[in-house]
């Protein structure tokens, strides 16, 4: 067997409508299915940027569900979403996030990406990034492990 690509992510969320609004309206990820009600199981919503049938599925688990544990631990660290190809698009994203009341928790120059970090309504960390000089990391994949620097845009 050989994995050929990462297909999709599924997140459990406390409040489907709140998360649907965040991923769909704030971040602009197109919702591709109607929001399913919880009448015959958990509520759910699927999203896709068009690369595949869906890149993100949200499943509602209710308000009493536990938050992701803080700090270093095993499990998912964050999801990364490519938002464009230029620092201008990253600057636009900063303005849009601030206008929507989203806190930017970090910003890094990873040599291969310029990245912003935020949290979704359930505390899942997200990386919003642009590729930097894709020809460089294609020629030298070790650049992915380059030291992280502060982002200055």
Role assignments for model-derived ranges:
Residues 1-3, 71-74:
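Short, flexible turn/loop "capping" segments at secondary-structure junctions
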Residues 8, 53-54, 78, 110:
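Histidine-centered active-site/metal-ligand motif
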Residues 12-60:
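Core segments of cupin and vicinal oxygen chelate
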